[in-house]
């Protein structure tokens, strides 16, 4: 690590900006690829319940590789780990373009994403510290959500024009992310020299799980972020089903526009969290989490496009304000106890287990014929109750 990298902890340093650009392109590819592949499934006449299964194979890769990716992120320069991971995403997207089964290609993208996540968040704690870390997380989330905004819309719009063109655009985005990773300064590995025996890595990972779960602050963060991202990915698929039922619109683009409104809102909410919430005042984000569920239930009852846009914008704002402080809390506390890479890998296990569970329940509800509006109302109410229970639990733990 160069001395300049050691001392320059500004969130506008060359290293931080390189990370943000690489993250934007990688997240753009992820989101465009999802909607392009969903369009491909439609053209190949897959049933509706198979759509969430596509995301389930993606998150299944996260869960399967969770014991190993944290150590990989901490054992090598994180910028190089990000580059290899984006290379795997590129291979998966290119495979789908060339006719590989979309579920197989998307699984490969999931493996790349699993390796990428601990490195992309872990590197923030190596490039900046303290309350700047909350701001860096806000910048990372804003970049990610901008990519979700543009990637989702690009994927849907291009797929309406030509599905293969949309898939090629995704592959090009991943290629750009690989190139951007080359400009990230090569940092010293956080925890080199660890054992690479699978049994030892598995024990080390589950030991990190235990350490983080026993700490009240990190347990609170793990549960909160798991609930949020599990709900978020389910909402994306709910929109695909809800739009033709509630609005009578059957194209690929409209669900992506609605998802984009959530993305815009998260950018605003993330910025507000960076200014209003510190590591010492994380509990300020909890009312926003409860309101997410309430607004989702109200949204599900809409039958016009304009109020749907407004409510999804509000859901995004609440979501950004809710999740950014929880991410920063876990990174700061986790870095000191088990290493940033391991902390994020444990977080990924929790988030993706929640996604797998929620997507499985959603797919089952669709399979048995539950109406989309009823799914949305039930989903919102249950989410609000879950966050309220988490807040009560956290306050009781803090009082002991």
UniProtKB/Swiss-Prot annotation:
Residue ranges crossing the lipid bilayer per the database entry: 19-39, 53-73, 91-111, 139-159, 164-184, 195-213, 227-247, 257-277, 281-301, 304-324, 352-372, 373-393
Gene3D superfamilies listed in its UniProt record: MFS general substrate transporter like domains
Recorded superkingdom: Bacteria
Gene Ontology cellular component list: plasma membrane
InterPro entries, per the entry: LysoPLipid__transptr_LplT (IPR023727), MFS (IPR011701), MFS_trans_sf (IPR036259)
CDD domains: MFS_MefA_like (cd06173)
SUPFAM superfamilies on file: MFS general substrate transporter (SSF103473)
Keyword tags: Cell inner membrane, Cell membrane, Lipid transport, Membrane, Transmembrane, Transmembrane helix, Transport
Membrane protein topology class: Multi-pass membrane protein
GO MF annotation: an example: lysophospholipid:sodium symporter activity
Signal peptide stretch: none
Entry keyword annotation includes Secreted: no
Function noted in UniProt: Catalyzes the facilitated diffusion of 2-acyl-glycero-3-phosphoethanolamine (2-acyl-GPE) into the cell.
UniProt cross-references to NCBIfam families, sorted A to Z: PRK11195.1
Record-stated family: Belongs to the major facilitator superfamily. LplT (TC 2.A.1.42) family.
Protein name: Lysophospholipid transporter LplT
